[in-house]
């Protein structure tokens, strides 16, 4: 968390060098959103199997969507210092592109803390499920480019990531 005067960031999850969950009980619930992305880079043999509908475990794109939705709701179980918050909406898009499989998630809540980690967890869990579903076709599949694209709401204000070209 940054100081509004531009001073050095404060580490809010540590007190006396020990990890702790930040107390958000005094914060009012507000509407917050976060959008994240990830890429799954496919070697030619994995891409060919996907396009031919010959993936050993079924449709990885559909499974990835469901996995991403589940990941957004289970973030507090996986990221130790995250608060369990109500995910009021989650959308996960999984699209085959020339550069690979592009995964995006948009997560919303009305809570005293944000949903950035929920969006990032959604795309990461979705990407890992794609890897699992396609690993029989190649071990050279790569998960790449996991990042926060935007966030709205909260004390730290809105954020918009810089544009960048698709992953190679």
UniProtKB/Swiss-Prot annotation:
NCBIfam families: moaC, PRK09364.1. PANTHER family: MOLYBDOPTERIN COFACTOR SYNTHESIS PROTEIN A. It comes from the Bacteria. Catalyzes the conversion of (8S)-3',8-cyclo-7,8-dihydroguanosine 5'-triphosphate to cyclic pyranopterin monophosphate (cPMP). Homohexamer; trimer of dimers. Disulfide bonds: none annotated. Its EC number is 4.6.1.17. Substrate binds at residues 81-83, 117-118. It catalyses: (8S)-3',8-cyclo-7,8-dihydroguanosine 5'-triphosphate = cyclic pyranopterin phosphate + diphosphate. This is Cyclic pyranopterin monophosphate synthase. Pathway: Cofactor biosynthesis; molybdopterin biosynthesis. Pfam families: MoaC. Belongs to the MoaC family. One of its GO terms (molecular function) is cyclic pyranopterin monophosphate synthase activity. The keyword Cytoplasm does not apply. The keyword Magnesium does not apply. GO terms for biological process: Mo-molybdopterin cofactor biosynthetic process.
